[in-house]
Amino acid sequence: MNNPPPLQRLDHIGDVLAFVRVADAQSFTAAAEKLSLSRSAIGKCIARLEQSLGVRLFHRSTRSVSLSDDGRLFYEHAQRILSEVDNATDAMASRQQAPRGRLRIDLPVSLGRLHVMPLVRGYLRRWPDVDADISFSDDYTDLVRDGIDVAIRIGGEADSRLVRRVLAPHRLITCAAPDYLHRYGAPATIDALAQHQTLVFTHTGQPVPWRFTVQGQERQVPVAGRLRVGHTEALRDAAVAGDGIAQLGAFLVADDLRAGRLAPVLESVAGAGAPVYAVYPHRRHLSPKVRVLIDDIAAAWSTDLPWRPYA
């Protein structure tokens, strides 16, 4: 064929579809039957496509049709184009469907009870065809193994089987009651914590180190206090009562900080930060029941984050 002008934009996805069907069937007639078109219409699609590309896509004879070298190259790309069109169509169809069915959600114990459950209840009122099964755990549940549709997590490691969407910023706050600070003073440095009563959170029976951001780097600090508690809300209660210094999530102590029941300490070395994520198994299309719930939480927190400005 003659050298083409600069490549023209392909305006007809139907031409690409016709090309792929001819290539698959190695027949204009079979492709025409599959697409419910006439053989001449298929021929016009291929001619228009070849004109746009400036190459010959098929070798034709009275008995056979086969791809040219250029045709084989274009075929590889054309298959991907049609696959993406199918994906886009399916995704749009999914967005138009109302949430329905059983929804399994896994939540961190305190964050889930205080800040996620009110949003889940509102979601269920809006979508009466959804039934929710909700589990609470501060462990990182295996979502794929346990059939969980979506989990809310603070931080955590990436997993190739899962998709993570950031819902909100979050960080740890080191704090104590004004009464405690009046009696014992505030630590001026991280090392000074050793001279204070520290309230220690335990996970699976082990003390969890405190985490600080020092000159842009995370520093983990082992703490050893007389009170070791495996429940963050009970630890918060002890801090408010003046029993010592605690490091707790901003989501848990923001109200206490605003009300003056707790005061931050060691503000020059902020507690480490980790976003709150929605985490769900990697799927070709996200179901409406999961997508809408995640969108609802993200929208609510974008306008009214309960632990702002301590995030």
Region roles according to the model:
Residues 100-163:
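Central regulatory/effector-binding core of bacterial HTH transcription factors
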Residues 21-36:
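Short helix-boundary/capping micro-motifs
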Residues 142-147, 157-276, 303-311:
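C-terminal regulatory
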Residues 16-19, 31, 68, 242:
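Hydrophobic two-helix hairpin corresponding to the core of helix-turn-helix DNA-binding domains
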Residues 38-41, 45-48, 119:
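Residues within the DNA-recognition helix of helix-turn-helix
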Residues 50-67, 262:
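A short LG(V/I)-centered, amphipathic sequence patch enriched
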